[in-house]
Regions:
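A short, Lys/Arg-rich alpha-helix, primarily the initiator
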Residues: 1-19, 55-58
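Conserved hydrophobic/aromatic packing and binding residues within compact polymer-binding modules
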Residues: 12, 26-27, 37-40
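Recognition helix of helix-turn-helix/homeodomain-like DNA-binding domains
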Residues: 31-49
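Short, charged recognition helix plus adjacent turn
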Residues: 68-93
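A short glycine-rich, aromatic-capped structural motif
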Residues: 95-152, 169-173, 195, 245, ...
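Functional-site microenvironments in short loops/helix caps that host divalent-cation chemistry
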Residues: 105-107, 113, 148, 154-289, ...
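Short, structured beta-strand segments at or near domain termini in extracellular proteins/domains
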Residues: 289-305
Length: 310
């Protein structure tokens, strides 16, 4: 399927045509006004919708049936759209964790370009969560263990509209406790960075072009977390979401006693803070409305579980 790196009015019209919808029907499908659709289509490739609408369009294409996707591919030439930069996805196996059911992707052992200076560094094989741990995911842990829920959950229950948003208001110890319960770990700084940048040391998950529209950062004006599968065009070479923006992510790597590294930036962060090679850390007891996590697992350990061997 053609992957739209940056939507313009031209691709929007192609999607509506592929879906065989009128302007009124298409506007209702996206949850925007008819006037907005007409404006986008009239201006064609000269207009780029706001990041929140880019995400809506990504989702509309992703959720379309195969016939619609095929028609869209034909209308757009089947190539990367809008001349935007992209990097080749890395073929790797995806699995569902046997305990939590969360989708994880394998990152094969290899050298990658680490840190701001792109230092070659070997990292053994591991799996990493494709998505951030959501409120719904974390609720299973709270229910199973009696662990204290995040402070913004009313009466110990997360707001229903935030079910698929990343869990926040968690300390490093909260995140580590979840990972242990799930039979996983928190990723190290090296594991996280490799999953974000690929083996060739791209500046961002999608390549070297600074494109804030591909992630949830302050410049986009979203002003809150977004669902964990929102920014498809901003995924990493391994297909991992939200490696730039949405929430800062706790990592296993200790910077100094009592402090742990975080990466990825957040909806509260300026875009330049979301660069995956950048360093950030915080006290293990820190928690905020822009800090969450995802999990990882050593390849051998997870594959033993998957194959039912000890």
């Amino acid at each position: 399927m053609a992957n739209v790196q940056v939507w313009t009015g031209a691709e929007i019209k192609a999607l509506r045509t592929a879906m065989r919808l009128s302007i009124r029907e298409f506007a209702a499908h996206l949850g925007v006004s008819e006037r907005m659709i007409s404006k986008w289509e009239a201006k064609g490739s000269d207009i780029t919708p706001l990041p929140v609408n880019q995400a809506i369009l990504d989702t509309a294409l992703r959720m379309s049936d195969p016939d619609t996707k095929a028609r869209f591919k034909g209308l757009t030439g089947g190539a990367e759209i809008s001349g935007a930069e992209t990097i080749e996805p890395i073929g790797s196996s995806q699995v569902r964790h046997p305990m939590t059911g969360s989708p994880m992707v394998k990152v094969d052992g290899s050298i990658y370009q680490a840190g701001p200076s792109n230092t070659p560094l070997w990292v053994p094989s591991y799996y990493i969560d494709i998505y951030l741990v959501s409120n719904a995911d974390y609720a299973q842990f709270v229910a199973a263990t009696g662990h204290e829920p995040p402070q913004h959950w009313e009466n110990g229950t997360f707001p229903k509209e935030l079910a698929n948003h990343p869990v926040v208001w968690v300390t490093w110890k909260d995140a580590a406790a979840y990972a242990k319960w799930a039979g996983k770990t928190l990723p190290t700084a090296q594991q996280w960075e490799k999953a974000a940048r690929g083996t060739r040391g791209a500046t961002y998950p999608w390549g070297d072009q600074p494109t804030p529209a591909k992630c949830n950062v302050r410049e986009n004006g979203v002003g809150a977390t977004t669902v964990v599968d929102c920014y498809q065009s901003g995924t990493s070479p391994y297909g991992v979401y939200d490696m730039c923006g949405n929430v800062w992510e706790w990592l296993d790597t200790q910077s100094t006693p009592g402090r742990r590294e975080l990466k990825g930036g957040a909806w509260t962060s300026q875009f330049d803070r979301a660069v995956p090679s950048q360093f950030n850390d915080a006290n293990e007891t820190m928690c905020d409305d822009d800090t969450g996590f995802r999990c990882a697992a050593p390849a051998e350990d997870l594959e033993r579980l998957l194959h039912g061997t000890e």
